[in-house]
Amino acid sequence: KKMWDIMMKNEKPGGHGERSVAVGTIDMAIWDLVSKIEEKPLYQLLSEQYGNGNPNRDVFVYAAGGYYWPEQGIVGLTDEIKKYLDLGYSVVKKKIGGASLAEDCKRIEAVLKVLGPNDRLAVDANGRFDLKTAIDYAKNLSNYNLFWYEEPGDPLDFELHKELSNHYLGPIATGENLFSMQDARNLIRYAGMRKD
């Protein structure tokens, strides 16, 4: 905390761009150094600092894939998903928005045939949708039991997310491209985020 206070002293609010990347890089280096000095794995040190000292040995991970590779087609996509399952993943995330809505729905349905119907598929638009497109996708995605609908629009477009939450009742994930506490706080306050 002291290092953050020093690095952010006299800084204006916000956290975009080079400053947040530089501070984040220094922050990671400091944690790595402290871990080495303490002769403890970083996960243990963080658990002691911010938890009860007993790190959770089970960490949720998912496989991210389902990109729009040239010549892949539906068979290639389902083969890719099967490989993730063979590696032990139970949840898979695939991209959407790189094809038409109808084509994306075909791809989703093909993946769901491999994964099964029980919320094991997340989809990620990488922030590319305007409000109308995000809602059009939401209406169609509501037909599937998805793990989440990720980054439908720009994460700083709080109005888009707030309105979208009125049209999509499943879990919505966003915020990985926010770089400040203020942005994360405003996302929670103004973007219609729900606890799910």
Q: What is the predicted function of each stretch?
A:
Residues 1-37:
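Metal- or metallocofactor-binding catalytic centers and their adjacent structured scaffolds
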Residues 31, 61-68, 89, 148:
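Tryptophan-centric aromatic hotspots in well-structured domains and transmembrane helices
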Residues 32-36, 83, 140:
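Residues within well-ordered alpha helices
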Residues 35-45:
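Short secondary-structure capping/junction motifs at helix and strand boundaries
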Residues 43-72, 107, 116, 169:
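N-terminal small/glycine-rich loop or linker at the start of catalytic domains
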Residues 57-78, 96, 125-130, 173:
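Active-site mouth loops of central-metabolism enzymes
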Residues 80-95:
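Catalytic domains of carbohydrate-active enzymes, especially glycoside hydrolases
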Residues 94-196:
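Catalytic core of soluble alpha/beta enzymes
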